[in-house]
């Protein structure tokens, strides 16, 4: 546990500096002001993950990868030391010395975290850190971690990537991007044993995000949809608390989605009552990049990429062609190492899916084997357990699957199905609001154009310049936003409709594809929380009355707020009790200094062209130490003289 706290201090510092440096262009040119250290850390983790993937294409991710990253972070921190001083307000004098050179608004907005947060809040964050370090130090090691996660991470540490690795173990072909980040922070080269606490760090950042959201609710005295999502995030964190010790890609993917959607909804809530301008486009575009990253962590999250349509429409309406090209390039930059590793490991772009057969390499996994692997995933998730019965109709396998679920999971699934028709209605209402607002914007634009034409007649010397000035002046005076903002202001309701669409499509994708709750906890929670949370917020606002005052009974005005407080009390009482029980059960495990190790399963050995390969004898559990391993004795050979040349099937 103590070693985890030390590792997290290093991770927090490095990821914050990397995120702060990489977001600097968006702060200065895009006008995107970020005041959250957690946001910078999340951005930094994305950058470090992509960096580790690129590094793995050429070498093992170990000492040199860490040294280069630390050097880059230090250089970035030195170059941006004034911005860092403004952010933390280390010295008021240093922040004010450049007052003539830098905007007062920027200095004023970058208020010190140490002054902004009172002692109680910092104690809360410290308590969360200790709690999640405790949970990350011990618990249940996921079955797949002993099967292949630990081995995949060690391959990245020692070799980066070798061609045809999926011929040794087909599960390596799944190639989650999170394994590269786990390898980067494994620190085996430094302490002689692997650490696996990155999932716990993601969980901690997500917990801080949820806590900040609920504290904002307490201050504003008004219920928002993001508050329901915060509850959903906390529910998921408690559900996986005793499993965070495992570097499973499912946890990474779900935590990333929770963080992105909570941030996305908070942005939408802040802007739904005011025009959307250029500055508000940047955060959505940056969050879209994180959705691309989530798809590289777990391919099943790619359905949420539908949200990318919203910033795309905003940028297209504002005709920001250069920005559009830039964001597309950044998305490709994030996806490329993942795709390259896919091809090198299995020969397929999206293993185990074979719809894109573009690379005729000698290490490619056969199409039949890949298709069978994909069917096994679906069969297992549907509680079928026989891949030859996968073609069962929905009415046959769905009742059996539902009966096999845990009691509370059944309630969540039923809530999801019940939310679908309501979500459709809410999505249509959002589109209608967007269309109406669009017509109003067109009418306003026509009035601005007429005013511009009149001005042009008065000043014939420069018709084009006068028209531009007149149109801009009228639009700013009438709408309160510049012309680019006016072009997209009416699209705010469209964001809500798109959220509803993503919630429904994601739920259907999970339910009809591979409906294992572990694969899609986010989808199971996202749909009912957004739908019924929206209805609750509408009812609460109706009870509160108009902004000018409440004409009904006084106790009704805050009924929605206090009812939500009661819901929070009941939720934290129930889930808090469960959390305390888990903490007590794990208290006797001796992991207060070091973290619980990977499983070390028994194994037999065989050779492939002089290379010793381990085969687990205990239900596929092999762990980290016995390396390299395969689930069975494989009929493979080396592609060259060394293991770095990779593996391929023996020719028949």
Question: Each predicted region: which residue ranges?
Answer:
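Hydrophobic alpha-helical membrane-interfacial segments at the cytosolic entry of transmembrane helices
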Residues: 120-131, 289, 315-343, 358, ...
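Active-site lumenal/periplasmic loops and adjacent helix-entry segments of GT-C-fold
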Residues: 131-226, 244-246
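Membrane-embedded, hydrophobic transmembrane alpha-helices
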Residues: 1-91
């Amino acid at each position: 546990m103590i070693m985890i706290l030390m590792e997290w201090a290093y991770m927090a510092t490095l990821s914050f500096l990397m995120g702060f440096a990489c977001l600097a262009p968006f702060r200065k040119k895009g006008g995107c002001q970020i005041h959250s250290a957690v946001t910078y850390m999340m951005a930094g983790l994305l950058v470090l993950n992509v960096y580790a993937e690129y590094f793995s294409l050429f070498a093992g991710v170990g000492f040199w990868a860490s040294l280069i990253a630390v050097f880059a972070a230090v250089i970035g921190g030195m170059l941006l030391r004034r911005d860092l001083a403004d952010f933390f307000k280390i010295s008021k004098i240093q922040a004010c010395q450049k007052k003539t050179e830098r905007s007062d608004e920027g200095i004023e907005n970058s208020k010190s975290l140490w002054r902004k947060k009172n002692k109680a809040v910092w104690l809360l964050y410290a308590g969360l850190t200790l709690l999640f370090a405790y949970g990350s130090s011990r618990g249940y090691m996921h079955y797949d971690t002993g099967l292949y996660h630990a081995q995949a991470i060690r391959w990245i540490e020692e070799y980066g990537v070798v061609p045809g690795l999926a011929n040794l173990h087909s599960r390596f072909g799944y190639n989650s991007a999170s394994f590269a980040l786990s390898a980067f922070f494994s620190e085996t080269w430094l302490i002689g044993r692997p650490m696996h606490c990155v999932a716990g760090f993601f969980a901690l950042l997500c917990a801080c995000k949820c806590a900040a959201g609920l504290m904002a609710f307490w201050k504003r005295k008004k219920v928002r949809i993001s508050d329901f999502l915060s509850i959903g995030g906390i529910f998921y964190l408690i559900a996986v608390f005793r499993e965070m010790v495992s570097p499973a890609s499912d946890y990474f993917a779900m935590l990333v989605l929770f963080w992105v959607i909570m941030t996305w909804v908070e942005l939408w809530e802040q802007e739904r009552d005011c025009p959307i301008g250029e500055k508000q486009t940047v955060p959505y575009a940056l969050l879209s990049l994180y959705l691309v990253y989530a798809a590289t962590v777990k391919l099943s999250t790619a359905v949420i990429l539908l949200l990318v349509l919203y910033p795309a429409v905003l940028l297209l309406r504002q005709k920001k062609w250069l920005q559009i090209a830039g964001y597309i390039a950044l998305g490709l930059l994030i996806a490329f190492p993942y795709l390259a590793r896919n091809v090198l490991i299995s020969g397929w772009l999206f293993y185990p899916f074979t719809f894109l057969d573009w690379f005729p390499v000698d290490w490619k996994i056969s199409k039949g084997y890949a298709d069978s692997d994909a069917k096994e995933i679906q069969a297992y998730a549907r509680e079928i357990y026989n891949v030859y019965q996968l073609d069962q109709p929905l009415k046959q396998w769905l009742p059996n699957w539902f009966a096999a679920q845990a009691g509370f999971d059944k309630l969540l699934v039923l809530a999801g199905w019940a939310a679908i028709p309501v979500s459709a209605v809410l999505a249509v209402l959002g589109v209608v609001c967007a269309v109406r607002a669009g017509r109003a914007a067109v009418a306003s634009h026509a009035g601005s154009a007429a005013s511009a034409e009149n001005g042009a007649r008065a000043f014939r010397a420069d018709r084009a310049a006068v028209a531009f000035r007149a149109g801009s002046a009228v639009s700013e005076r009438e709408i309160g936003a510049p012309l680019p903002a006016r072009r997209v202001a009416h699209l705010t309701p469209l964001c809500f409709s798109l959220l509803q669409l993503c919630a429904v499509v994601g739920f259907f994708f999970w339910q009809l594809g591979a409906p294992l709750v572990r694969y899609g906890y986010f989808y199971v929670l996202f749909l009912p929380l957004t739908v019924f949370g929206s209805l609750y917020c509408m009812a609460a606002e109706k009870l509160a009355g108009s902004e000018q005052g409440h004409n009904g009974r006084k106790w009704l005005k805050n009924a929605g707020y206090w009812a939500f407080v009661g819901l929070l009390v009941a939720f934290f009482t129930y889930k808090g009790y469960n959390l305390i029980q888990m903490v007590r059960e794990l208290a006797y495990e001796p992991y207060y200094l070091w973290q619980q190790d990977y499983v070390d399963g028994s194994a037999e050995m065989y050779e492939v062209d002089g290379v010793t390969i381990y085969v687990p004898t205990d239900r596929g559990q092999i762990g980290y130490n016995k390396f390299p391993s395969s689930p069975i004795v494989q009929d493979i050979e080396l592609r060259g003289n060394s293991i770095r040349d990779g593996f391929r099937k023996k020719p028949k």
